């Protein structure tokens, strides 16, 4: 059996479905994320600039290779509509085949 592989899963939230889908699509098309999953709406409760807030947000999980992580982050920040977006990642274990797929450069990157 092959060794377990490793990938990064980056999680963020967006103020609406359109922004979530746009970022997910663009980051995958640029080859910076191998897969992005836009999840349904959640309700966020938070303090921002001294005020209590409640907002509907959309969660997106991006699958990113360790090699692409810094480039992904720069593009993510460029595309995200929030001044201070939620951005956290986990290094996770994945099946060997899935990790290989996430970590293999896209075909159009070599052209």
PLM features per residue range, with description:
Residues 1-111:
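Positively charged, small/polar-rich N-terminal and surface patches that mediate targeting and assembly
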């Amino acid at each position: 059996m092959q060794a377990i592989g490793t990938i990064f899963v980056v999680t963020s939230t967006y103020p609406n479905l359109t922004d979530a889908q746009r970022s997910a699509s663009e980051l995958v098309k640029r080859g910076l994320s191998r897969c992005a999953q836009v999840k349904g709406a959640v309700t966020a409760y938070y303090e921002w600039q001294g005020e209590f807030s409640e907002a509907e947000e959309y969660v997106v999980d991006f699958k990113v290779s360790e090699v692409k992580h810094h480039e992904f982050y720069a593009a993510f920040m460029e595309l995200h509509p929030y001044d201070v977006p939620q951005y956290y990642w986990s290094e996770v274990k994945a099946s060997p085949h899935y990790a290989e797929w996430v970590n293999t450069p896209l075909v159009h990157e070599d052209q």
